[in-house]
């Protein structure tokens, strides 16, 4: 079980979210030591707003972002540890990082919400010895509700950054692009199936 807890200004745990999607990829063997979360998709109430915290692998699932948005999240936050496996070519590395940014910026656009993604940097050896380890690509970023980049960190060093986010823009963007309003919820039953026959 992987849990992210948000600590309020009074230094007490405000709420929890448990990672729902667990990977089993080269150098990411989490299915062997984590259990999928059981708390669902519930934003965490803070003095900063309602934060939709989704952990790492959850970032690839538009359903998770949508459920957080529908539950009232005002910002989607993705604490992440993702990088390149040692055998990835430079072209593959570029594709992976671009896909990683694109999918999360897509969550911002589809839900009319800012996205904050925080990723680690550095290298970690694979304790199993199956691979040469992972080089984490950093590149933490903040995107606005239209997917526009408000900030991007470097790929190879730790940084601290303060980024202003205008939460009022989400309402404006949702009026221009009313994706939540125009959903065809009557036609989405098959989304809960593993495969469609």
Language model features with spans:
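Short, well-ordered, mixed-charge alpha-helical segments that flank or form enzyme active sites
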Residues: 14-15, 22-27, 53, 61-63
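Cysteine/selenocysteine-centered motifs that mediate thiol-based redox chemistry or coordinate metal-sulfur cofactors
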Residues: 36-70, 170-197
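CN hydrolase (nitrilase-like) catalytic-core segments centered on the catalytic cysteine
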Residues: 50, 56-160
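Conserved hydrophobic/aromatic beta-strand scaffold that supports enzyme active sites
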Residues: 16, 41-43, 142, 160-164
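Single conserved hydrophobic/aromatic residue that forms the stacking wall/gate
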Residues: 1-13
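Short hydrophobic alpha-helix segments
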Residues: 15-18, 153
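A short, polar/charged loop-to-alpha-helix boundary motif
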Residues: 18-33, 157-174
């Amino acid at each position: 079980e992987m849990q992210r807890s948000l600590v309020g200004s009074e230094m007490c745990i405000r709420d929890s979210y448990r990672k729902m999607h667990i990977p089993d990829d080269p150098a990411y063997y989490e299915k062997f030591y984590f259990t999928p979360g059981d708390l669902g998709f519930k934003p965490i109430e803070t003095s900063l707003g309602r934060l939709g915290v989704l952990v790492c692998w959850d970032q690839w699932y538009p359903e998770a972002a949508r459920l957080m948005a529908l539950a009232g999240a005002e910002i989607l936050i993705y604490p992440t540890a993702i990088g390149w496996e040692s055998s990835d070519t430079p072209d593959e590395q570029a594709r992976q990082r671009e896909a990683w940014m694109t999918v999360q910026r897509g969550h911002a656009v589809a839900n009319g919400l800012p996205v904050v993604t925080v990723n680690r940097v550095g290298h970690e050896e694979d304790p199993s010895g199956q691979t040469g380890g992972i080089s984490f690509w950093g590149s933490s970023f903040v995107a606005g509700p239209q997917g526009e980049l408000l900030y991007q960190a470097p790929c190879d060093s730790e940084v601290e950054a303060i980024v202003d986010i205008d939460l009022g823009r989400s309402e404006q963007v949702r009026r221009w692009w009313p994706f939540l309003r125009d959903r065809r919820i009557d036609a989405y039953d098959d989304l809960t199936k593993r495969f469609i026959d």
